[in-house]
Structures are given as C-alpha cells and as structure tokens.
C-alpha cells in the first residue's frame, strides 16, 4: 500500500512538473506577444506625435503672422490718432495765440489812448492852475476889500444897535443855546416816547408772562395772635395769684397778654413777630401742660426759643429749595428764615421774597440772562428787615452789608442795596429785583396800609407837584396811583410840560415809599372864548 501511495505521489509530481513547464511556455509566448503589441503602439504614438507637432508648428506660425499683422494695424491706427490730436492741439494753440495777439493789440491801443488822455488832462490842469493863480490873486484882493467892508459894517452896526461885538456875540450865543435846548428837549421827548412805546409793550409781555407763571396765595398778617383755651377757667390760671403768672410771662417773653370777655381765647400782642411766635408757643405748652408758674414759664420759653430757631433754619432751607438755590451761608439761611415771622404792610416778608425771586428768574430768562444771580439777589433783597430792630440804617443798606460780609457776589450785594434806589442801579439784575419787588408788593390785596400814612402820602404827592412854577391845580386820584397836574398854558409850554411830568415823578420816587407805581399826568389846556352879541 505504501508503494501505491509513493507511485501516486510521483505521478502527481510529474503532472505538476508538466503543468509548470506548460505555464512557463504560455507565459513566454504571451510576453512576446505583448512586447510586439507594445512596440507597435509605440510606433503609432511616435507617428501621431510627429503629426501633432507638425500641425502645432504650422498653427503657431499662422497665429504669429496674424498677430504681427494686427500689431502693425494697431500701431498705424494709434499713430494716426496721435497725429490727429497733435494737429488739433496745434490748431487750438494757434487760435489762442491769435486771440492773445488781438488782446495785446487792443491793450496797447488802450494804453496809447490813456497816455494821450493823461497828457490832455495834464495840459488842462496846467491851464486850470494858471487860472486859479489868477483867481487867487483876485480873491486875496477881494478878501482885503471885504475885511475893510466888514470892519466898517461892524462899526456901523455897533453904532446903530448900541451893542459891542462881544455883547452881540453873547446875545447870539444865548439865542442859539435856547434854540438848541428847545430842539434837544423835543428830540428827547420823541426818543422817550418811542422808547416807552417799545419798552412798555415788551415789559408788559414779560411781566404778564411772569405773573401768569407765578400763582401764590397771600393772606394779610397782623401783630396779634389768638390763642384758644380749653375753658375760661384757664384765664384765671394764666393770670395767677395777684397777677403773678401774667407779669412773669410778659417780663420773660416781652409779649403782652390781652384777656377780655372773648370766650375761651386770649390775645398775644407784640410788634416783633419772632417774640410773639415764641410767646405763643410758650403759652400753648403751658396751657397744654396745665402747670403755670414763673419757673415753668422760663423753661418753656427757653424751649420755644430753640424751636423757633429750628423753624427759622428750616423755613430758610425750604425757601432756598423752592427758589432753586443750592448753597448759601448758614447765617444767611437763619436770617432768611426769621423773615417768616415778619410782615411788611401786612404781607409776609419770606413769602414775598420767594414770590419775587420766582418773578425775577422768569423775567431774566425772558431777557436771555442767567436767572441764578437775579433769583439770589431778589431772594435776599429784604434780608435787612430781619435786623432792622437791632442795627441802625435802612434795611437795604443793612442787608447789603450782611450779604457782603458772608461772601455773596457783588452783583447780588448791589441788587440788595439798590432795590429802593438808595444806590443808583448799575446792573440789569438790580433793575429786575426792583421790578419783581414792585410786582409782588404792588398787586391788589398783597399789602395794606394804615389810613394815617395813606393820607400823609397823598398830601405829600400833591404838595410836590404844587410846588412847581406854573402849576394851577393838583389832584391825587385812584387811591394815590395817579396824579393829575393842571398847568397854566401861558407859563408852561408843551416841552416844559413833558419835563415837569418827569421831574415830579422823579421827586416822588426819591422821597416817598409806596407800593406799586404812580402815574404823573400833566394837563395843559388852552381855551379860546368868543362872545356873540
């Protein structure tokens, strides 16, 4: 069996050998065939490449010849275009040169004509100079003759008139001065009339706008405070045994206590509103507590002093906030707050200052001026009224000195001292302060005046106008708001009437203190009377 297997193995090996030799033979044949095919393909490719190269060379030569022809055509066309442009430029330059030649020729002609004209004028001037020399000689001779004639005429005039030349000159100067004064007065009247018309319209518009934008309540205040009591029995406790309590209260506070038949009420009277307010607070605390005796009165009065001082500071700060002012010296704020308890003709001074500051700020804004200085000066313009009982002098001057002492701007100080014309106003802010003060205090119902001072003011107004020469009658009308002056027409002409109205108004403004404004009207009436018989 092993032998069979070995034979089969040898047979298989032989078969494998045969297959291998056959495969090698087939591979060699196939390789030869492929080589021949590749050689044939290579020859075909070389032939095709040669043909393509020949065609490419031919195409390149053709394109080169075409490009050369196109370049020659382009060069020729560009050369022609450049030649045409050069010809056009040359023609233009020739045209300009011909124009310049023409203008130069014209200018030369004008220069020649001007030279001839100048020569002609020189000849005329020489002739004129000769004529003037002759006339000057004649004028000198005539001037000498005229001088002699003038001297003779002057001597004759002096002989006829009985006046020397100096006296005649003085008389002539006086006549000219009178005429110039009359012309000046007429012109001043016309200028003032036009200025018043324009200024009145604008001022009316500004003031009306300011009043419309400021609406404030106003109540008249008096020098008496009323304190309500829980019962009439409290009046006896206020009086005390043998009047001990009421005497102690009046001596400590400086406030008079008026006890009458009015049920459940007592009156506190004092000209100083600050002391009256401290007395009211003191008595209110005593009545509420029920213990009324001299020692208790002193304690409550000390507490009332501190309370009123705090209220003054708070009132001053509230006024600054209301007006829109950021900073101010603490002492000025305190003095400003004290004005809360002071009145002027029944008008609360602090309320008047706040209202006036708003008015001044609005008017300054309408005039395109910074409102800060106007508001500040107007708010402080009555500052001196807080110290008029303690310092001598008018409240305007005192207030200005206080403001200057505490570092206020000089414009603010000037507005304070000039608001009653004790110092001549030199700035618009001072004039605005005056206007705001007059608007706030002069509107109906803002202030009240006593009958005695009112009558005295009317009498003085009529007296001021009656003292003028040529015045026939004077009438104070409309509660002293208008003065009508009747003049003698033979003594006062139209120009003098205008000057009289201005002088009377100025004197009233300088001498008197009054709310609002006063109109002075001068009436000059000429009557012609004829009798039919």
From Swiss-Prot:
Residue ranges annotated for the KH domain, each copy included: 223-289
Coiled coil stretches, renumbered: none
Annotated GO biological process: mRNA catabolic process
PROSITE patterns for this protein: HD, KH_TYPE_1
Gene3D superfamilies the UniProt entry points to: Hypothetical protein af1432
Molecular-function GO term, any one: RNA endonuclease activity
Pfam families: HD (PF01966), KH_1 (PF00013), RNase_Y_N (PF12072)
Role, per record: Endoribonuclease that initiates mRNA decay.
Record-stated family: Belongs to the RNase Y family.
Protein name as annotated: Ribonuclease Y
Organism field: Parafrankia sp. (strain EAN1pec)
Gene encoding the protein: rny
């Amino acid at each position: 069996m092993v032998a069979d297997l070995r034979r089969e193995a040898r047979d298989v090996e032989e078969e494998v050998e045969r297959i291998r030799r056959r495969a090698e033979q087939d591979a060699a044949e196939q390789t030869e065939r492929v080589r021949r095919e590749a050689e044939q393909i290579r020859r075909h490719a070389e032939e095709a490449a040669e043909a393509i190269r020949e065609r490419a060379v031919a195409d390149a030569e053709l394109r080169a010849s075409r490009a050369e022809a196109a370049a020659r055509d382009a060069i020729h066309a560009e050369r022609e275009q450049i030649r045409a442009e050069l010809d056009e430029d040359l023609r233009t330059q020739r045209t300009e040169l011909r124009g310049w030649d023409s203008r130069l020729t014209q200018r030369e002609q004008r220069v020649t004509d001007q030279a001839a004209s100048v020569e002609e004028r020189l000849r005329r001037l020489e002739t004129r100079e000769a004529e003037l020399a002759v006339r000057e000689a004649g004028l000198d001779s005539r001037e000498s003759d005229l001088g002699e004639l003038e001297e003779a005429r002057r001597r004759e005039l002096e002989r006829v008139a009985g006046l020397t030349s100096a006296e005649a000159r003085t008389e002539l100067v006086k006549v000219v001065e009178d005429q110039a004064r009359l012309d000046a007065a007429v012109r001043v009247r016309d200028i003032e009339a036009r200025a018043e018309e324009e200024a009145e319209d604008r001022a009316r518009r500004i003031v009306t706008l300011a009043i419309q934008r400021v609406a404030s309540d106003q109540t008249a205040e008096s020098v008496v405070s009323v304190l309500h009591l829980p019962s009439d029995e409290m009046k006896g406790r206020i009086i005390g045994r043998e009047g001990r309590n009421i005497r102690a209260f009046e001596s400590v506070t400086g406030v008079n206590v008026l006890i009458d038949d009015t049920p459940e009420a007592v009156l506190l009277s004092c000209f100083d509103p600050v002391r009256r307010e401290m007395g009211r607070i003191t008595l209110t605390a005593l009545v509420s507590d029920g213990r009324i005796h001299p020692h208790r009165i002193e304690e409550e009065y000390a507490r009332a002093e501190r309370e009123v001082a705090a209220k003054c500071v708070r009132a001053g700060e509230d006024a600054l906030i209301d007006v829109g002012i950021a900073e101010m010296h603490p002492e000025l704020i305190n003095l400003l707050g004290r004005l809360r308890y002071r009145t002027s003709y029944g008008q609360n001074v602090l309320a008047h200052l706040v209202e006036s500051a708003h008015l001044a700020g609005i008017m300054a804004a309408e005039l395109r001026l910074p409102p800060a200085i106007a508001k500040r000066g107007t708010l402080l313009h009555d500052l001196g009224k807080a110290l008029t009982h303690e310092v001598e002098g008018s409240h305007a001057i005192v207030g200005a000195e206080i403001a200057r002492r505490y570092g206020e701007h000089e414009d603010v100080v000037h507005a304070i001292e000039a608001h009653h014309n004790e110092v001549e106003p030199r700035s618009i802010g001072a004039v605005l302060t005056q206007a705001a003060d007059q608007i706030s205090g002069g509107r109906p119902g803002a202030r009240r005046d006593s009958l005695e001072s009112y009558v005295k003011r009317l009498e003085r107004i009529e007296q001021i106008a009656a003292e003028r020469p040529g015045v026939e009658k004077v009438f104070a009308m409309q509660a002293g708001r208008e003065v009508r002056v009747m003049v003698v027409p033979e003594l006062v002409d139209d120009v003098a009437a205008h000057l009289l109205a201005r002088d009377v108004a100025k004197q009233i403004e300088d001498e008197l203190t009054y709310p609002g404004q006063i109109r002075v009207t001068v009436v000059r009436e000429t009557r012609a009377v004829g009798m039919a018989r």
